[in-house]
Amino acid sequence: MFMQTKIFAFAGKGGVGKTSLSAAFVRILSESFPDKRILAVDADPAIGLSMALQMQPSLTLDDIRVQITENIERGKTTEAIELLSEARFHLLDSVVEKDNISFLAIGRPEAAGCYCKVNAYLKRVVETLCENYDFVVI
């Protein structure tokens, strides 16, 4: 039977326990459904979920976004197909896996203010990756 990806998002003001709830929920899903694939996404610039799950990414989504933007500005990447290929390649490098859990972090954008660009990129990444997972926890 086909199971559509279930997406869970924990949101709220700072300090209300989003990271703790997300980590506990990911662990419960992992233990309850060991045959299912789980994508845990840390959308908090503080990167607390990586510590809670003990999964350290070597590359974050913002690192990828910045690298691709720099390549465009330098003229290294110009074609849409090159951009898509480069983004997918780096995206695979940014996912950390342990047991049935895959982990992805948004990172900490260097620019002050709005997180709009990296959040828009995160949305696209989750849309792209979610078909490979049974559960996505953000």
List the predicted regions and their residue ranges.
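Phosphate-binding P-loop
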Residues: 1-5
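Walker A/P-loop phosphate-binding motif and the immediately C-terminal alpha-helix
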Residues: 8-45
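Short, glycine/charged-enriched secondary-structure capping and boundary segments
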Residues: 24-25, 53-57, 118-120
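Phosphate-binding/switch loop-helix module in NTP-utilizing enzymes
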Residues: 80-138
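Signal for well-folded cores of large energy- and translation-related assemblies
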Residues: 30, 54, 126-130
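N-terminal phosphate/diphosphate-binding loop that engages ATP/GTP or pyrophosphate donors
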Residues: 31-97
